[in-house]
């Protein structure tokens, strides 16, 4: 009992994930991500009324993309982090402290800077044909195809502090402050090619667009240092957690310097050949273009509000309503793309001896705060429901269920999706099944 270490927890996970992106039934690119992750937590005995401990987190990820439309090179990411958390009560006030230091290393071989033809989205190819004959290459295309190795090391750190005040029975107020850094991912740095999953020609932050002095627009290696995201955040909360009626209200404000996101360039690039299967003749292949989006590190602000109210009406019936809204803006002016719209949801639950049921009604507001080259998204209402009948079969618990989604057959687009215009949410659907635990 006098030992300093109270408990040790360890977790190890190995994942070998693979998926393929299809274009009209043809595999365009196969992604393979093999990762090993380990975490060890050491909790100490209480000393001077402090509770907490240390944790060590290690992760290794090997990523490859193979195919005609592989937009990122093979890369290896290694990270190891040491974190510390502590908390202590001072009367009705709980003080929480935390810190984290990390080392992240990104290595990639065969990073490509290919020669591509860029055209303005405001004009067609005939008006702006930047492709010259091979015997008379333009300055913008000379030497554009290059291969090189990349190695970057980042040392992000994080600090946090919070107070929770139980100012009366069943209620508390909370405030938390945090300062954190994040290393960019391999895809945010190294991407260069067509990405079917987003419908963009993606270019990583390691490359910069050059279009000054009357030159033909082209990409080259950036002259700027690769930076980490730096965020400063404040959260305020009010909770009621005792009794049949409760609520949580939370407001937050976050300033992020060098926030990585995909920014529209106003240009398009040749993305390869058409795989639609149309007959273009024996010696003719039709190419297509995609809008070019480049990862950019910009200073942004995010602020918003979240609320949740829950009421246990009777022993069998419960009701919950919650909503959230967020604004995300560039400090230089303008909106961040693909910001979620305001949302309001209501949930009704019934739990009987044998029968349980749920009804979900969600209202997504119209999103009109859009970035350049981004369209607004109409609001919509989604209604889902399910009914379950529970029974026993021997020693096993089983349930027959009927599930219905999008009961009103609403046409709905997800504003946060890169492909919202091509892949709306599914229409009305029903599922009947049985589930159990053995």
Indicate residue ranges for each PLM-predicted region.
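Gram-negative outer-membrane beta-barrel transporters
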Residues: 252-256, 260, 264-370, 389, ...
